[in-house]
């Protein structure tokens, strides 16, 4: 018997014996295809099954299903001979209440909210110019690479970045995230970002863990929650000090670019000049009013005294302005020095060679004789064999 023959027999057996079945479960993944067909996974506590509902059938459904929906389906089981993969073909669909994941999320959210963990009174302010920034995420994630790339593009070299590796998906992820959070919170950081890129509701569910939420609330370090995409909400978003819709948005919120800093200093100088001119104008008007009021020859001494007071005030204002300008110049010099130091580092990094084996970054001490590796820099790459 060939695989095709076996699959055809299995298909006939399934379609004969599994007709008009009522199937209940929770959607864990779904794709609303451009063709109009719906493809999704339905799960219970222990298992899941691939399902499909074709356009002709789903036009009769009065809602768009989503991850977390608990559904009751009617249909039959079928099998594709080409792949040997079987799935449930739904002919009707109706909602049967909230799914387990959604129910757990809403129950925990309501309980923590009543306890006050989401209260704005407990939110810590984010630093304006952070110098020590921690990022908790998977060290191999695309989200981390996107964040580091954006920091480099902004030319913000004042901050030192600390990476805390943690699982961001699966049953062991909450414990891993908590351990990383405790370690980071003991390092006297200015701010901490908990980040993960997009994924299904199940993929992100580790950030709905109650113990993780309580550790975030207890942390002394200001925390930004940057999980998934803008439409994704998890418990850590509500308990953190600030919620960023994406990991990249967290970087945009936290870091100024070099141009932003220069514009801020220019604006500060402009405001100081406006304040100085305003004060001078006020005192000039005061002197003018006094000179009009005191018209008698017996009062020239008083007028002279007021003029001297005005001159003294003008000197004080000039002195204050000069001090502020010197302070701004020193601050700008520090920013420029920091930029030049880090710019030199990044220029040197262009000469670094990266070793990859089987598509992954490899440590030199892990390589063996006859291993085939790829040596790459920012400008080229070569294949090499370890002797």
Swiss-Prot record:
GO MF assignments: exodeoxyribonuclease VII activity; nucleic acid binding
Q: Where is the protein found, in the record's own terms? A: Cytoplasm
Q: So what does this thing catalyse?
A: Exonucleolytic cleavage in either 5'- to 3'- or 3'- to 5'-direction to yield nucleoside 5'-phosphates
* GO cellular component term of the entry, any: cytoplasm
EC code(s) of this entry: 3.1.11.6
Q: Does the keyword Nuclease apply?
A: yes
Keywords per UniProt: Cytoplasm, Exonuclease, Hydrolase, Nuclease
Top-level class of the enzyme under EC nomenclature = hydrolase
Kindly state a single biological-process term from the GO annotations of this entry.
DNA catabolic process
The source's superkingdom equals Bacteria
InterPro entries in alphabetical order: Exonuc_VII_L (IPR003753), Exonuc_VII_lsu_C (IPR020579), OB-fold_nuc-bd_dom (IPR025824)
| Subunit field text | Heterooligomer composed of large and small subunits.
PANTHER family from the UniProt entry: EXODEOXYRIBONUCLEASE 7 LARGE SUBUNIT (PTHR30008:SF0)
Family to which this protein belongs = Belongs to the XseA family.
Describe the function of this protein: Bidirectionally degrades single-stranded DNA into large acid-insoluble oligonucleotides, which are then degraded further into small acid-soluble oligonucleotides.
| Record protein name field | Exodeoxyribonuclease 7 large subunit
Protein's organism: Campylobacter jejuni subsp. jejuni serotype O:6 (strain 81116 / NCTC 11828)
């Amino acid at each position: 018997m060939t695989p095709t023959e076996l699959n055809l027999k299995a298909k006939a057996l399934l379609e004969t014996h599994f007709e008009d079945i009522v199937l209940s479960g929770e959607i864990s993944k779904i794709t609303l295809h451009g063709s109009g067909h719906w493809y999704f996974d339905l799960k219970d506590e222990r298992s899941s099954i691939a399902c499909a509902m074709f356009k002709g059938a789903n036009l009769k459904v009065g809602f768009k299903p989503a991850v977390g929906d608990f559904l009751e389906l009617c249909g039959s089981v079928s099998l594709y001979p080409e792949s040997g993969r079987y799935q449930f073909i739904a002919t009707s669909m109706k909602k049967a209440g909230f799914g387990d994941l959604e129910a757990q999320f809403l129950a925990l959210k309501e309980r923590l909210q009543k306890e006050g963990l989401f209260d704005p009174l407990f939110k810590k302010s984010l630093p304006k110019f952070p110098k020590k920034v921690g990022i908790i995420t998977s060290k191999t994630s695309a989200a981390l690479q996107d964040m580091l790339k954006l920091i480099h593009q902004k030319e913000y070299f004042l901050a030192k970045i600390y990476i805390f590796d943690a699982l961001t998906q699966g049953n062991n992820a909450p414990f891993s995230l908590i351990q990383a959070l405790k370690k980071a919170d003991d390092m006297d950081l200015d701010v901490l970002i908990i980040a993960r890129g997009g994924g299904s509701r199940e993929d992100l569910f580790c950030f709905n863990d109650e113990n993780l939420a309580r550790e975030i609330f207890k942390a002394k370090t200001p925390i930004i929650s940057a999980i998934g995409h803008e439409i994704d909400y998890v418990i850590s978003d509500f308990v953190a000090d600030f919620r960023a819709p994406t990991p990249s948005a967290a970087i945009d919120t936290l870091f100024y670019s070099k141009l932003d800093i220069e514009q801020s200093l220019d604006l500060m100088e402009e405001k100081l000049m406006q304040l100085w001119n305003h004060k001078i104008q006020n005192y000039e008007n005061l002197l003018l009013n006094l000179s009009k009021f005191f018209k008698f020859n017996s009062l020239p001494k008083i007028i002279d005294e007021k003029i001297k007071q005005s001159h003294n005030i003008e000197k004080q204002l000039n002195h204050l302005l000069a001090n502020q300008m010197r302070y701004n110049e020193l601050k700008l010099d520090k920013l420029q020095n920091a930029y030049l130091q880090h710019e030199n580092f990044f220029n040197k990094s262009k000469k670094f060679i990266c070793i990859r084996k089987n598509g992954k970054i490899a440590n030199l001490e892990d390589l063996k004789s006859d291993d085939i590796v790829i040596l790459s820099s920012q400008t080229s790459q070569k294949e090499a064999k370890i002797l």
